[in-house]
Amino acid sequence: MILITGGRAQGKRAFWEKNIASGEGEPSEISGLWIRGGQTSFDECLDSPYVCEFHLFIRRLLLGEPSLNAPDWVYGTMEKRNGCRLPDREALTERLFKACPGRVLVTDEIGLGIVPLDPFEREYREETGRICCLLAARSEQVWRVPC
């Protein structure tokens, strides 16, 4: 897996398409293959080799959004906290690696700046950071794009 992280609108996908994906086709061919975590189903996100907006996928998991169609195993035995359905982080990251080991995953780095007053927003930042740390620890490459 290759994890690419950075601030919002920093050109993370374009960085991948232009500088790294040279052996996988033209950038225009690859740009149509991205699955958006804020819009896709759980299974599509699990199986896709190119996932962007992964932080929004995690947000949807925490909200228990019905359109995500997340299976029950992803939540494990964790209870709700601050309005969040907490996922089983280890099971989720394991499944992501097993389903598509060569995946390129792009996520926004959302843990910087002022800590939000809203308990859900704090929980969202914390869970996203912890899941991304687990992914980074096992990824072949981790790129931080600071533009």
Residue ranges and their predicted role:
Residues 10, 56-57, 111:
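Short, solvent-exposed loop/turn segments at secondary-structure junctions
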Residues 1-38:
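Glycine-rich P-loop/Walker A and Walker A-like loops and their local beta1-loop-alpha1 context
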Residues 24-101:
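Conserved inter-motif catalytic segment of the P-loop NTP-binding fold
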Residues 13-15, 60-62, 115-117:
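Short glycine-/acidic-enriched loop or helix-start segments at secondary-structure transitions
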